[in-house]
């Protein structure tokens, strides 16, 4: 049986008896069946493995005959495996169901040692304890306790130090003695109670002696009580252990080594399993959604004990359902995904290729102090990053020049080798000087704010992704049209507007078409913290009960953005502290007392159940595996409503999305209504639709957002247009408007009607903006409602003598315009409509 890709055709078990009001899903029953079979047979059969497979890479070197290898059947004997269902699939309940099905799994012979010709197995006569040891991270122990309370299992929670008193005797003494083997600790009491049974060596005496005895230090001594230990083992099915308390746990059970029924470690990929961990059971289970990561964490020593260095064989030890089967079994509501592009510092944008990825990640998270520390800089400014980068090159240059001077003073034994060494050093010196000169030129170009093309101060400065050169946006667009869509500096082909980045320059702002970005605040011109403030403020005003999770890899990030979060008038908290404090914070969040919960993804990115949240914000991009874990905190078993996932990304961060939902770009504050009311959005366009249809969708989104924001203004405009139309009706002759330059106008309209999208997207738009200002051309924006909508059959004449009639506004046209907006019929989105432009009266 294959345990790696379980599906609906795989065997299932019946609902385990002992779960209170919890019915397991089909995929969970399938996992329990596979886990029970693996525990029973303790072996995995591999029949006729392929040459070149991971199994062949691991064991093929032991077999010289390839034909024998291909035709053979292999058996892996194991007492350890990994439950690796996807994030949020309910692995905790699956594990509890496994224990309820069989409290103690079958014991198997243990391989001790051997060679190719013999092996030694141990048939152990030692019986295991009827207790399942579950080791969990400190932030999940109360969550596990809540799940165990929903079953009939009897468990002992070992979280605080006082929980271990169930195994100990405690007495109080005034004098410290060396600890015996049965004694665990002897510590002084800080707050001495009034009445305490203290053992003293002397009795009686004067009042002064008694007073001196009262002033003596009192020590609390803890000793093992074997009867209490035995009683705890006999009366409990599960020991629930905080991984941070393992040292104390080991002290108690080290004197008499125990063999457990099962050892289960939750979140094996992120749990801080200590190096001294040495617990085994009849069968060992590790729970994680990312099994490949267990070799890279602090538990690597324990994992290597079990699996050795056979990482290629890891999939054979994994019990996992197919993700399609899990999705079908759970039927979770599909999340809405939003992308908000924010502004990165201009200097960082230019030199992002020279900044280490680790430091760039810190900058993206807003953790500039840590970024400066990584670069050995003292002051928190972007300019210092450039100084450090040039300083490293200067240091390398100095070392090379010193080495060249040293080599020149040597008396060579091999002249050719000596000359080659000098030549290599000189080439490296030239490389450093060129690199340093290039950086200085870029710095001067930014500080002087002078365009290479027009030699004037920058207007809408734009950085090329190919060579990091900076130009005015207008100069760049003009040059791209004349030289054939190539970079003016390095001649690299420019295929779309993604090949360059428009950045802010002091007080100037990016001039974009109103149809592209509508709103008071354009997010690509704002700092990430300010954008977060706008998003939270909008949610606060338009959602009665917001529950928001904000994740970042760094705790220092939250120190910076707390001021912005506070301005949103929402109650917020940072998740940290003891398990009891964490549980209280989560309870307040679920009850709506706290609206925003800030979490460090490194500490709380896995394991927690936070499906009550309706918004999840990733403040910066993380590792793909970690992002999956983070989103799984809310998108998991038990969720009923659609989750809104918001990615906040800078220009240098990737925009890939591993979720099934297609990301929706939020460009300004006027489009934030899509976050709070995602159900008003139309269905996604077909995959076959081209870029033109996507642009129409974006325009329709902008149209609805602008209409929604300025409805009062539209009413007044409609009234004025109605008055104009009534005046036109009174006149017998039709009114015609002739453009200033009919040739240019007809050519311009003809070009847009043909949907010539072979040109650069974004470049022609910017150019059209300049032309539209001169000719009075309106784009397909909110202003076009004053003139009505052109149908597909309407044609615009190309001749100089042609005149364009202004269509009359009627009720039919107003109804059709409403359908074109987001939230209307789906047909209008799926059909590719040409972009119409009208002549202003």
UniProtKB/Swiss-Prot annotation:
Biased composition (Basic and acidic residues): 698-725
Zinc finger regions, RING-type: 451-491
Acidic residues composition-biased segments: 681-697, 765-774, 782-804
Residue stretches of biased makeup (Polar residues): 206-215
Domain Helicase C-terminal: 531-682
UniProt binding sites for ATP: 85-92
Biased composition (Basic residues): 195-205, 726-749, 809-821, 828-841
A Pfam family recorded for this sequence: Helicase_C
GO biological process, one term: DNA repair
GO MF term list: ATP binding; ATP-dependent activity, acting on DNA; helicase activity; hydrolase activity; zinc ion binding
Chain ranges for the short sequence motif DEAD box as given in the UniProt record: 266-269
Region (Disordered): 195-215, 678-841
Coiled coil feature spans: 413-450
InterPro entries: Helicase_ATP-bd, Helicase_C-like, P-loop_NTPase, SNF2_N, SNF2_RAD54_helicase_TF, Znf_RING, Znf_RING/FYVE/PHD
Protein name in the entry: Putative helicase R592
Gene3D superfamilies named among the record's database cross-references: P-loop containing nucleotide triphosphate hydrolases, Zinc/RING finger domain, C3HC4 (zinc finger)
């Amino acid at each position: 049986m294959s345990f790696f890709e379980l599906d609906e055709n795989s065997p299932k078990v019946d609902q385990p008896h002992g779960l209170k009001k919890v019915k397991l899903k089909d995929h969970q029953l399938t996992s329990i069946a596979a886990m029970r079979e693996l525990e029973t047979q303790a072996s995995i059969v591999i029949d006729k493995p392929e040459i070149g497979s991971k199994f062949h890479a691991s064991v093929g070197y032991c077999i010289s005959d390839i034909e024998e290898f291909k035709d053979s059947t292999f058996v892996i004997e194991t007492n350890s495996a990994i439950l690796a269902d996807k994030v949020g699939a309910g692995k905790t309940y699956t594990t509890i169901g496994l224990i309820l099905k069989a409290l103690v799994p079958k014991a198997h012979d243990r391989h001790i040692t051997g060679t190719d010709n013999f092996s030694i197995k141990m048939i152990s006569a030692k019986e295991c304890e009827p207790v399942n040891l579950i080791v969990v991270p400190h932030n999940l122990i109360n969550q596990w306790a809540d799940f165990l309370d929903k079953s009939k299992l009897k468990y002992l929670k070992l979280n605080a130090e006082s929980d271990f008193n169930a195994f100990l005797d405690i007495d109080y003494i005034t004098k410290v003695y060396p600890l015996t083997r049965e004694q665990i600790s002897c510590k002084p009491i800080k707050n001495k109670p009034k009445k305490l049974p203290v053992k003293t060596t002397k009795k009686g005496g004067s009042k002064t002696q008694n007073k001196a005895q009262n002033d003596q230090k009192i020590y609390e001594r803890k000793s093992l009580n074997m009867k209490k230990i035995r009683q705890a083992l006999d009366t409990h099915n599960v020991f629930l252990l905080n991984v941070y308390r393992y040292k104390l746990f080991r002290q108690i059970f080290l004197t008499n080594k125990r063999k457990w029924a099962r050892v289960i470690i939750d979140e094996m990929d992120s749990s801080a399993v200590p190096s001294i961990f040495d617990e085994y059971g009849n069968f060992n289970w590790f729970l994680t959604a990312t099994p490949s990561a267990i070799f890279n964490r602090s538990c690597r020593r324990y994992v290597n004990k079990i699996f050795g260095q056979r990482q290629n064989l890891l999939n054979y030890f994994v019990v996992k359902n197919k993700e399609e089967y899990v999705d079908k079994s759970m039927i979770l509501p599909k999340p809405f995904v939003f992308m908000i592009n924010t502004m990165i510092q201009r200097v960082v944008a230019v030199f992002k290729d020279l900044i280490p990825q680790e430091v760039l990640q810190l900058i993206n998270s807003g953790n500039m102090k840590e970024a400066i520390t990584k670069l050995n800089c003292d002051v928190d400014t972007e300019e210092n990053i450039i100084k450090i980068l040039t300083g490293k090159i200067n240091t390398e240059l100095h070392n090379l020049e010193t080495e060249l001077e040293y080599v020149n003073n040597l008396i060579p034994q091999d002249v050719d080798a000596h000359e080659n060494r000098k030549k290599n050093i000189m080439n490296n010196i030239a490389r450093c000087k060129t690199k340093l000169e290039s950086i200085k030129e870029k710095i001067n170009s930014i500080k002087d704010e002078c365009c290479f093309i027009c030699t004037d101060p920058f207007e809408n400065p734009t950085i090329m992704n190919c060579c990091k050169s900076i130009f005015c946006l207008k100069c760049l667009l003009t040059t791209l049209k004349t030289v054939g869509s190539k970079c003016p500096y390095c001649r690299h082909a420019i295929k779309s507007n993604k090949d360059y980045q428009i950045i802010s320059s002091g007080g100037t702002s990016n001039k974009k078409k109103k149809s592209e970005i509508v709103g008071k605040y354009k997010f690509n011109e704002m700092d990430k913290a300010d954008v977060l403030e706008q998003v939270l403020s909008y949610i606060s005003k338009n959602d009665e009960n917001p529950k928001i999770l904000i994740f970042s890899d760094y705790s220092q990030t939250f120190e910076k953005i707390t001021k912005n979060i506070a301005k949103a008038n929402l109650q917020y908290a940072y998740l940290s502290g003891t398990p009891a404090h964490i549980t209280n914070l989560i309870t307040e969040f679920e009850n709506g007392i706290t609206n925003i919960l800030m979490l460090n993804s490194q500490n709380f990115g896995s394991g927690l159940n936070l499906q009550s949240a309706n918004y999840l914000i990733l403040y910066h991009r993380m590792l793909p595996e970690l992002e999956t874990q983070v989103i799984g905190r809310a998108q998991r078993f038990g969720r009923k409503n659609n989750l809104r996932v918001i990615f906040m990304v800078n220009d240098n961060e990737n925009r890939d999305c591993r979720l099934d939902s297609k990301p929706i770009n939020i460009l300004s504050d006027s489009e934030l209504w899509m976050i709070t009311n995602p159900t008003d959005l139309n269905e996604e366009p077909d995959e076959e639709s081209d870029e033109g249809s996507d642009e129409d969708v974006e325009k329709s989104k902008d149209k609805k957002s602008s209409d929604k924001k300025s409805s009062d203004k539209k009413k007044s405009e409609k009234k004025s247009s109605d008055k104009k139309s009534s005046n036109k009706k009174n006149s017998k002759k039709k009114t015609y408007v002739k453009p200033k330059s009919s040739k240019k106008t007809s050519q311009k309209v003809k070009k847009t009607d043909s949907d010539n999208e072979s040109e650069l997207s974004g470049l022609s738009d910017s150019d059209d903006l300049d032309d539209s200002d001169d000719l009075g051309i309106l784009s397909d924006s909110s202003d076009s409602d004053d003139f009505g909508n052109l149908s597909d059959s309407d044609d615009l004449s190309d001749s100089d003598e042609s005149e364009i009639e202004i269509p009359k506004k009627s009720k039919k046209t107003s109804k059709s315009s409403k359908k074109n907006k987001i939230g209307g019929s789906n047909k209008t989105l799926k059909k590719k409509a040409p972009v119409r432009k009208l002549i202003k009266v």
